[in-house]
Amino acid sequence: HERSSAASDVYKRQGNEIFIIYSNDPRKVNYKQFGIKKATLIDNTGAWTDEEGLNQHIKNPSVERAILTAPAKGKIKNIVYGINDERLKGDEKIVGAASCTTNAITPPLKLIDEAFKIQSGHIETIHAYTNDQNLVDNYHKSDRRGRGAALNLVITDTGAAKAVSDVIPELKGKLTANAIRVPIPNVSLAIMNLNLKKSVGVEELNDLFKQAAFHSNLRTIIDYSNSIDGVSSDFYSNEFACVYDAQATISNFNCVTIYVWYDNEYGYSRQVV
């Protein structure tokens, strides 16, 4: 997240040249002229989410594999780094990296489920608006997203609950999810209301996440915040998949509510890489 300028179709960053290539057909892009071969291509267009569409990249002789930055459909594996990447055998041509929200909520859900067993739950994401929404009221196939994104709180759906169950099969059918798009450009918040098998206190939950953030194999994925005045802008450019907000945790016997922040751009990009 920083300003840059590009006078041509080459963007220079930290001594590297990044070429800006224009094409309407991924099969016909001439990557060879840029010295690109056996490439891993990251598709974040959102144009294709299934094997048929994404195979267009693979048919290009310079592309060896493709990673989708959205929940993949069909038989494509959805992978959240640090959670289920052991499923990768190394011979996959196409892999789905799920979504920014799925990458943010899956690590905390796995952590809590392993410790206390999740019986059911609902996840509400307070999500920065995206380029899928209209800036002024206009037609959109998803009606509410057609309303002005910079002026409204917009209730919309999210596939995060289903995507979580793809990554953690034990949670299949136990979670629901929804989203509220809000008029900020970046950093989102997931609120998880969970019913557990046993009663758990706030201190016990905070200890669980503190240990995970500092002393477990999730320490590069889950961050821990104990700030009493933390707000969304504090987590701009945070490199973790999610940041557990210890001050916001609520417990009512076996019903708990946890809050996790996430930079839905930079934090997710780190997960993809």
PLM feature spans:
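Short glycine-/small-residue-rich Rossmann-like dinucleotide-binding loops
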Residues: 24-25, 45-46, 71, 99
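Rossmann-fold NAD(P)-binding glycine/threonine-rich loop
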Residues: 47-92
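Rossmann-fold dehydrogenase core element
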Residues: 81-100, 117-124
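Short alpha-helices
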Residues: 95-109, 113
